[in-house]
């Protein structure tokens, strides 16, 4: 299970905690990134529970956050000669997106904790692009996604397994205009060469049970 979320998110919702607890009981391998925010909070929660079936993905020489040294440290190779990926001594957003894409490819399904917009330090609206990309990259591979949409917590964890349903229920009805504009532009520019992965029906039922 690939767990991701907005960097700006500070807390893990109770519904998500329950889902992660159920994943641990089933001994699923949990894939998580190394960013602050949700990544770090999920790591800390799994560390506190002494859960070992965890893989932390990163692009640098070592993870920025790595709560348990017994976990799998999974580095995604990035060409540091490419300024789109490594500039001024730092890995770029594009490099981090390669890491996230690898996690989407490796996972069987995903759980996303998402607030689609926040205000940056200049007071302008900023779209949480990484989590949205993760949702899209999972869905186009026919992989289930459980989405906890932070602005509407009463909806709990919403379940999706195709792009059309996600667009109808979330993009068209819930998100801010800036997010909607970004999403359709991203979708337009996305590669048409993504290979689809069909998941056995038995796995679908088991995975969906986590998002009750």
Language model segments and positions:
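Acidic/glycine-enriched connector segments
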Residues: 9-164
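STAS-typified acidic loop motif
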Residues: 1-8
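A conserved mid-domain beta-alpha-beta active-site/ligand-binding segment of alpha/beta enzyme cores
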Residues: 81-92, 178-204
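Acidic, PIN/NYN-like endoribonuclease modules and their adjacent C-terminal/linker elements
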Residues: 143-192
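Positively charged, lysine/arginine-rich intrinsically disordered segments
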Residues: 208-212
């Amino acid at each position: 299970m690939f767990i991701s979320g907005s960097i700006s998110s500070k807390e893990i919702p109770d519904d998500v905690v329950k889902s992660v607890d159920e994943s641990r009981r089933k001994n699923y391998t949990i894939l998580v990134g190394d960013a602050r925010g949700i990544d770090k909070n999920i790591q800390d929660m799994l560390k506190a529970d002494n859960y070992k079936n965890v893989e932390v993905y990163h692009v640098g020489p070592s993870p920025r956050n790595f709560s348990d040294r017994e976990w799998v440290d999974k580095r995604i190779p990035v060409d540091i000669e490419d300024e789109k990926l490594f500039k001024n001594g730092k890995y770029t957003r594009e490099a981090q997106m390669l890491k996230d894409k690898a996690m989407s490819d490796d996972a069987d399904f995903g759980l996303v904790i998402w607030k689609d917009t926040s205000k940056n330090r200049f007071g302008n609206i900023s779209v949480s692009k990484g989590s949205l990309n993760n949702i899209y990259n999972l869905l186009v591979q026919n992989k289930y996604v459980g989405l906890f949409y932070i602005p509407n917590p009463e909806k709990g964890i919403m379940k999706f397994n195709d792009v059309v349903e996600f667009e109808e229920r979330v993009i068209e009805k819930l998100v801010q205009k800036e997010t909607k504009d970004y999403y359709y532009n991203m979708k337009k520019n996305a590669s048409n060469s993504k290979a689809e992965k069909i998941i056995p029906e038995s796995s679908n039922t088991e995975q969906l049970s986590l998002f009750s």
